[in-house]
Regions:
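Short, well-formed alpha-helical segments that are part of the catalytic scaffolds
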Residues: 12-26
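A conserved acidic beta->alpha catalytic loop
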Residues: 22, 29, 33-50, 64, ...
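Conserved donor nucleotide-binding strand/loop of the catalytic core
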Residues: 49-70, 74, 78
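Cell-envelope/extracellular polymer assembly enzymes that use nucleotide-activated donors
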Residues: 2-4, 32
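Short aromatic/hydrophobic "clamp" motif used to bind/position activated sugar donors
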Residues: 84
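Catalytic-site signature of metal-activated, phosphate-bearing donor transferases
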Residues: 69-76, 92-205
Length: 205
């Protein structure tokens, strides 16, 4: 079984470097990394260039043009694996998730796996929590398990839809991983980054 780890990146150079370091040390040789770059960020290009000097990956540029679904669909179209595991550049998977992703897929003939995500926002205040209607645990996790549709068969029928707050369609069978931090994606960010993203999304809607 071959898994394509698809990454979309804009200007998250340090986050991309962290993610690539994690994947390089954990994924199997037959797997692949697919990187879709939006824009011309020199730091991102430097990180990718450094990675390609010692590793292989499918890398291409594509403008977002306000359409997140089309951007993610382009990753699928450039992937050759049996399954696609989509990860945003500012996220990273737990070691346990990477370790068990293939055994889980091999034991379950399903189209889609929903993955729990640990969101943390450095600098968040009670005012932010009330304003956005978030649930925050004692550990500081926002809206956990915040399930994400990220691991799916590489099939022509399965594609993302909606320009903003995109959702995946075409999967007939699916399952949810248990809400366990050892099987989660991690999504840390600062409050400044959160507010920047909120403003960007509001302009697109």
């Amino acid at each position: 079984m071959k898994v394509s780890y698809g990454i979309t990146v804009h200007n998250e150079a340090e986050e991309l470097k962290r993610l690539l370091n994690i994947l390089t040390n954990k994924i199997d040789k037959e797997d692949e990394i697919v990187i879709c770059i939006d824009g011309d960020d020199e730091k991102v290009e430097s990180v990718v260039g450094e990675y390609l000097s010692e590793n292989e990956a499918i890398v291409y540029k594509r403008k977002l043009d306000g359409d997140f679904a089309a951007q993610k669909n382009s990753v699928i179209e450039n992937s050759t694996g049996d399954y696609v595991f989509h990860i945003d550049a500012d996220e990273y998977p737990s070691d346990g998730l990477l370790e068990y992703v293939k055994p889980i897929l091999e034991a379950n003939d399903i189209d889609l796996i929903w993955v729990p995500r640990v969101n943390t926002v450095d600098g968040i205040t009670e005012q932010h929590i009330q304003q956005w209607g978030w649930r925050v645990s004692d550990a500081g996790w926002v809206n956990y398990p915040d399930y994400q549709s990220r691991i799916f068969k590489n099939s022509p029928e399965i594609r993302w839809k909606s320009k903003v707050h995109e959702r995946i369609f075409g999967a007939e069978t699916f399952s949810h991983l248990p809400p366990n931090e050892t099987l989660s994606l991690y999504h840390p960010k600062t409050i400044d980054k959160q507010e920047e993203q909120n403003n960007f999304y509001s302009k697109l809607m």
